[in-house]
């Protein structure tokens, strides 16, 4: 096995992580700005994924993974939101959550439902890390707890 073969899985995983982060950002943008899915996907693919924008270099991301998450969340939102709502504490409504947290939970829930080929632990860990990139307080713990509850309900398994 060559060195190049050893590096390929890590690169793919890293590109999926970058795609997840970009998907959360795109979903946030859609939520706040009312941007449509086709417009936001085209913008990210042309100007953000692996590109430099306003002095920031965006990580190279798996574009098909990005598209799958963004379009899947939009397509399945009426199924995702009730699941997320049922996993929140009784006195919390999804609408009370920060838009970024909503985007993270929707993307994570979509992957738990749709990407059975990806272990729950990977999905939950990736989205908790994304939450840490945006928040220093309790939001990452909330993301962990909610996605873990959803995984138990949907797949019968939790993050190990």
UniProtKB/Swiss-Prot annotation:
GO terms for molecular function: RNA binding. Keywords: RNA-binding, Transcription, Transcription antitermination, Transcription regulation. InterPro entries: NusB-like_sf, NusB_fam, NusB_RsmB_TIM44. Signal peptide: none annotated. GO terms for cellular component: cytosol. GO terms for biological process: DNA-templated transcription termination; transcription antitermination. It comes from the Bacteria. Involved in transcription antitermination. Required for transcription of ribosomal RNA (rRNA) genes. Binds specifically to the boxA antiterminator sequence of the ribosomal RNA (rrn) operons. Belongs to the NusB family. This is Transcription antitermination protein NusB. It comes from Rhizobium rhizogenes (strain K84 / ATCC BAA-868). The lineage of its organism: Bacteria, Pseudomonadati, Pseudomonadota, Alphaproteobacteria, Hyphomicrobiales.
């Amino acid at each position: 096995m060559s060195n190049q073969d050893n590096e390929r899985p890590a690169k793919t995983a890293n590109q999926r992580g970058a795609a997840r982060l970009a998907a959360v950002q795109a979903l946030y943008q859609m939520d706040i700005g009312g941007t449509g899915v086709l417009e936001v996907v085209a913008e990210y693919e042309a100007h953000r994924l692996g590109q430099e924008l306003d002095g920031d270099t965006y990580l190279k991301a798996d574009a098909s993974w990005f598209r799958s998450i963004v379009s899947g969340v939009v397509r399945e939102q009426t199924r995702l939101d009730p699941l997320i709502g049922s996993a929140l504490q009784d006195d919390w409504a999804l609408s009370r959550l920060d838009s970024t947290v909503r985007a993270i939970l929707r993307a994570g829930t979509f992957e738990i439902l749709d990407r059975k080929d990806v272990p729950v632990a990977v999905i939950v860990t990736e989205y908790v890390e994304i939450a840490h990139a945006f928040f220093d307080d309790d939001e990452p713990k909330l993301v962990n707890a909610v996605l873990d509850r959803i995984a138990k309900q949907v797949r019968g398994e939790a993050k190990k």
